[in-house]
């Protein structure tokens, strides 16, 4: 008799958990806010809208990797973001190949400085945003000045910009967010 009660308790527990969680969801009880350390963009935007030419997209998402990106407007300020991006990629350990690093720039006057900066950080893809539309879109959807701050932003494998990390955010917290996302 004691074993039957124990068996019934084990079998009923998962069903009870599902029922209670469904009721909480139905009646609107949910956690307030998020535990993300990054800042979500005001609206999601897709990178398919940024084309370099009629056939060529700004960046390809065929490989199914997440993208850590930096838009370089000031090579000195962006060097900190590029360094942090490399360190975060290394800290991902076994997930290192699920993320690629990309640097964008549009100011052709900075081309030599940018290429010299990127040479310090191997495995970072450099992409020219010829029209500058990406920077404008980032600026319009962010709460900080993307032109001055040069923060790291995250793009999902489907090409949607998800979030960015304000300068000064603790790298351990950024790494924690990346591990949750990936």
Question: Where do the PLM segments sit?
Answer:
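N-terminal targeting signals for export/organelle localization
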Residues: 1-51
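Short active-site neighborhood of thiol/selenol oxidoreductases, capturing the structured segment around
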Residues: 59-78, 83-85
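Short loop/turn microsegments at loop-to-beta-strand junctions
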Residues: 65, 149-151
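Structural beta-sheet core signal
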Residues: 68-70, 101-104, 154
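Short, charged/polar "capping" segments at the starts of alpha-helices
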Residues: 77, 107-114
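Conserved helix-turn-beta segment immediately C-terminal to the redox Cys motif
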Residues: 82-102
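Short, internal strand/loop/helix patches
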Residues: 102, 113-149
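Thiol-/selenol-based redox modules, centered on thioredoxin-like
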Residues: 154-182
């Amino acid at each position: 008799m004691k074993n039957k009660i124990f068996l019934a308790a084990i079998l009923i527990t998962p069903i009870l958990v599902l029922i209670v969680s469904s009721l909480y969801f139905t009646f609107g009880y949910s956690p307030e806010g998020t535990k993300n350390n990054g800042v979500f963009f005001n609206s999601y935007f897709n990178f398919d809208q940024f084309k370099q030419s009629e056939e060529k997209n700004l960046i390809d998402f065929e490989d199914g990797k997440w993208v850590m990106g930096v838009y370089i407007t000031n090579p000195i300020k962006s060097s900190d973001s590029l360094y942090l991006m490399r360190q975060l990629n290394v800290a991902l350990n076994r997930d290192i190949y699920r993320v690629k690093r990309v640097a964008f720039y549009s100011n052709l006057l900075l081309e030599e400085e940018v290429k010299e900066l990127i040479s310090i950080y191997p495995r970072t893809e450099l992409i020219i945003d010829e029209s500058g539309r990406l920077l404008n879109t980032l600026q319009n959807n962010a709460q900080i000045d993307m032109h001055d701050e040069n923060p790291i932003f995250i793009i999902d494998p489907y090409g949607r910009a998800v979030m960015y990390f304000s300068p000064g955010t603790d790298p351990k917290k950024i790494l924690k967010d990346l591990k949750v996302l990936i």
